[in-house]
């Protein structure tokens, strides 16, 4: 039966998804490009296009300035994003491992996943079923070939066993008609089994086809889709043929990852080299001239006609060396992989650009407040926030990388270096057109990638000193992150914890609560018992039994902590109250008590509170220890 709420609800939240910002979205969010390495000028004012540019909002500690973008002060200005345009493409440190897996899984010649075509088609159908919510059908589809073939194989084994047995006895028997009848019966049973399996296969495939044609999602699946996609992604990666491509029969070299900054193409093993020479008469050098750019140390003759070149004797030592893969080359590999395997990969990822970064978002000024040296130390200087210092390092590495390339190519001389640098700030350099084999250029790019990694995830830093500085990921994750510390399970008004200690003199249905917890945990009680709540309001926040807040009918909440006694008496006057008093916990209040880990229902039980004025621990009767699986050696309960 429809209710009034059904008519009021116009839409429902079906689900959420997370993705990386692309370059267009970053450009739309940003209010200014940041490329000035100087945060402040000589007069200690924020510089234009600097890391503390006033267009990105006002610092939370600055009570006087106004934001140049919205015109608000530090109280009302939400802050505005900026961006740093990277000189060249950098790797996304959060997807580095996945990028390495894809590089190892693709063929460097035909640019396809080294998985048989039938298995790729099967994975595509299973992914579509999972996206629609038909997880059972997707799992059956993966097992269908296995159980059908196993049943047929078992029948064949039975047939062979019977035939063999009858054949041995045939030498002893004179009558062979019985043997022929058994053979015919076993063969007929096998044919019936195969026909039955074919019919089951056709019925199941028709059911799958109807699901895919209707394209109707299954709504009652919860978050199981995420787990299923994660599992099938691992299955896809485990299905990759180690070296020889099943599509073009070419042996592929191994791709090695060096930390979180570089990829190297290793030389072919001796076994693969012999296999290539025996099957093709040459080593396929299309690995990969079209994408090697200036890094390729191979001769590019005949690459337009056949894409292949024979191994020359003078290049034998060169072939044994590992080759550095630039980000531009890896980007080209991923683009070609997506061109061929887009049906499968688009079901797993947004696109290949999530593995790379051309622009880096800069957070608002209010989230990067400066810190002062302090009056006690006699240092009145302001120091940059840790993230501001990391962003400044990225800008310096960005400029150093650009100048290294410009000097290497002799694009500019000393007189017009600054002018050309200003003109090219918005132009990204294509590394495939530069002599990237230079160790200086590779080192400059590695420093840029390292600085980006430190800012986003300092655990990927190569140097120990950089690992100690918290990046954006460290700001969010683990127990000390803002999600668990500030948002998830925040114990403010209705929860508290302390160490437990035994007390045989309280009842089994009671729990002893220290007074400091009782003053913190409040209960929102409507103003009905006037005299009782009057005393609570007058006692205030620091005297038990008291109150911490008063909530008025319009939703305004007033704290009693800093009120004077006269203000408290004025607030306790009853004038058609309809107020809510957030009073302290008192003896007799029912509580839910829990000891983690919560393994079964008795781990959370209800008790009546007894306020203990001079205690610092939660007091509990011995008989409740078994339910909570607790002992008194320092366990905590809440």
From Swiss-Prot:
Xref: Gene3D superfamilies: 2.40.40.20, RNA polymerase ii, RNA polymerase II, clamp domain
Protein name (record): DNA-directed RNA polymerase I subunit RPA1
GO annotation, biological process: DNA-templated transcription
Known EC number: 2.7.7.6
Annotated Acidic residues bias: 297-317
Family annotation (SMART domains): RPOLA_N (SM00663)
Cellular component terms per the entry's GO annotation: mitochondrion; plastid; RNA polymerase I complex
Superkingdom, taxonomy of origin: Eukaryota
Location(s) in or outside the cell: Nucleus
Region (Disordered): 297-321
Keywords: DNA-directed RNA polymerase, Metal-binding, Nucleotidyltransferase, Nucleus, Transcription, Transferase, Zinc
PANTHER family xref list: DNA-DIRECTED RNA POLYMERASE, DNA-DIRECTED RNA POLYMERASE I SUBUNIT RPA1
UniProt similarity note: Belongs to the RNA polymerase beta' chain family.
Note: Three distinct zinc-containing RNA polymerases are found in eukaryotic nuclei: polymerase I for the ribosomal RNA precursor, polymerase II for the mRNA precursor, and polymerase III for 5S and tRNA genes.
Quaternary structure (record): Each class of RNA polymerase is assembled from 9 to 14 different polypeptides. This subunit is the largest component of RNA polymerase I.
GO molecular-function terms, A-Z: DNA binding; DNA-directed RNA polymerase activity; metal ion binding
Organism: Euplotoides octocarinatus (Freshwater ciliate)
Function: DNA-dependent RNA polymerase catalyzes the transcription of DNA into RNA using the four ribonucleoside triphosphates as substrates. RNA polymerase I is essentially used to transcribe ribosomal DNA units.
Catalytic reaction annotation: RNA(n) + a ribonucleoside 5'-triphosphate = RNA(n+1) + diphosphate
């Amino acid at each position: 039966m429809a209710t009034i709420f059904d008519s009021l609800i116009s839409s429902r939240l079906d689900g959420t998804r997370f993705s990386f910002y692309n370059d267009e979205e970053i450009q739309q969010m940003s209010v200014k490009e940041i490329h000035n390495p100087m945060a402040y000028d000589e007069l200690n004012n924020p510089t234009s296009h600097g890391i503390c540019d006033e267009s990105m909002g006002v610092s939370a500690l600055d009570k006087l300035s106004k934001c140049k973008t919205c015109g608000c002060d530090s109280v009302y200005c939400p802050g505005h994003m900026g961006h740093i345009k990277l000189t060249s493409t950098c790797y996304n440190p959060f997807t580095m491992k996945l990028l390495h897996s894809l590089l190892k899984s693709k063929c460097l010649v035909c640019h396809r996943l080294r998985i048989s075509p039938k298995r790729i088609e099967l994975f595509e159908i299973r992914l579509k079923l999972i996206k629609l919510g038909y997880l059972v059908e997707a799992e059956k589809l993966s097992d269908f070939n296995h159980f059908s073939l196993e049943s047929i194989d078992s029948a064949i084994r039975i047939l062979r066993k019977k035939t063999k047995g009858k054949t041995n006895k045939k030498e002893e028997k004179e009558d062979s008609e019985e043997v022929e009848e058994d053979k015919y019966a076993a063969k007929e049973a096998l044919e019936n089994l195969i026909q039955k399996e074919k019919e089951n296969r056709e019925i199941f495939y028709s059911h799958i086809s109807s699901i895919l044609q209707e394209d109707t999602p299954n709504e009652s699946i919860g978050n199981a889709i995420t787990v299923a996609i994660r599992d099938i992604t691992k299955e896809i990666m485990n299905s990759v043929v180690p070296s020889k491509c099943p599509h073009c029969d070419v042996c592929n070299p191994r791709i090695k990852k060096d930390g979180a900054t570089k990829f190297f193409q290793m030389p072919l093993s001796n076994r693969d080299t012999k296999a290539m020479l025996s099957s093709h008469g040459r080593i396929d050098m299309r690995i990969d001239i079209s994408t090697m750019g200036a890094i390729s140390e191979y001769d590019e003759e005949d690459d337009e006609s056949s894409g292949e070149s024979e191994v020359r004797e003078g290049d034998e030592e060169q072939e044994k060396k590992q080759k550095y893969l630039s980000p531009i080359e890896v980007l080209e590999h991923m683009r070609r992989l997506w061109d061929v395997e887009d049906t499968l990969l688009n079901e797993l990822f947004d696109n290949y650009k999530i593995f790379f970064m051309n622009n880096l978002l800069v957070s608002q000024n209010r989230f990067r407040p400066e810190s002062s040296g302090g009056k006690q130390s006699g240092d009145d200087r302001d120091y940059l926030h840790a993230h501001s210092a990391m962003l400044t390092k990225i800008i310096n590495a960005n400029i150093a990388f650009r100048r290294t390339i410009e000097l290497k190519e002799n694009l500019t001389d000393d007189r017009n270096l600054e002018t050309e640098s200003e003109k090219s700030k918005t132009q990204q350099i294509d590394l495939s057109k530069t002599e990237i084999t230079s160790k200086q250029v590779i080192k400059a790019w590695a420093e840029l990638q390292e600085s980006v990694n430190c800012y986003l995830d300092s655990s990927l830093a190569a140097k120990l000193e950089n690992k100690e500085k918290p990046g954006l990921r460290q700001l969010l994750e683990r127990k000390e992150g803002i999600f668990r510390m500030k948002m998830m399970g925040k114990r403010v008004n209705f929860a508290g914890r302390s160490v437990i200690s035994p007390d045989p003199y309280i009842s089994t249905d009671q729990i002893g609560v220290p007074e400091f917890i009782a003053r913190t945990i409040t209960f929102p009680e409507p103003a009905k018992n006037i005299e009782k709540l009057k005393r609570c309001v007058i006692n205030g926040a620091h005297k038990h039994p008291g109150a911490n807040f008063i909530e008025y009918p319009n939703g305004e909440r007033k704290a009693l902590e800093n009120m004077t006694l006269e203000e408290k008496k004025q607030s306790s006057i009853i004038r058609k109250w309809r107020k809510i008093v957030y009073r302290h916990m008192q003896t007799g209040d029912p509580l839910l008590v829990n000891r983690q880990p919560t393994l079964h229902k008795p781990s959370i039980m209800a008790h009546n509170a007894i306020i203990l004025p001079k205690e610092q621990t939660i007091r509990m009767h011995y008989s409740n220890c078994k339910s909570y699986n607790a002992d008194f050696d320092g366990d905590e309960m809440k």
